[in-house]
């Protein structure tokens, strides 16, 4: 029993193999891109706050908090007597 190579049965040249592998890799890339698009859509519905305002107000305190703290604590600076 002799073995017949697949190249002898199906004459596949280099260009056909290259196109086959590029098609396979492209289909995998499209599948991953679709998954990433679904993740973006699901996160968009959870965010109800405008994103430009989140960074602007981080670390900010209201004016009433500042005045309350000013009356609660004495000044940290030592006055020099000369």
From Swiss-Prot:
Residue positions where Methionine amide is found in the record: 58
Tissue: Expressed by the skin glands.
Proregion residues excised on maturation: 28-47, 62-82
Any GO BP: neuropeptide signaling pathway
Subcellular location: Secreted
Signal peptide annotation: 1-27
Cellular component per GO, a single term: extracellular region
InterPro entries named among the record's database cross-references: Bombesin
Alphabetical UniProt keywords: Amidation, Amphibian defense peptide, Cleavage on pair of basic residues, Secreted, Signal
Membership in a protein family: Belongs to the bombesin/neuromedin-B/ranatensin family.
Protein name, entry field: Ranatensin
Species of provenance: Lithobates pipiens
């Amino acid at each position: 029993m002799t073995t017949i190579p697949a190249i002898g049965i199906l004459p596949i040249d280099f260009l056909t193999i290259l196109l086959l592998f590029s098609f396979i890799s492209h289909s995998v890339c499209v599948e991953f891109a679709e998954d990433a698009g679904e993740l973006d859509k699901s996160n968009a519905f959870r965010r109800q706050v405008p994103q430009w305002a989140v960074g602007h107000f981080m670390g900010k305190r209201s004016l009433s908090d500042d005045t309350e703290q000013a009356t609660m604590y004495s000044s940290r600076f030592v006055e020099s007597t000369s």
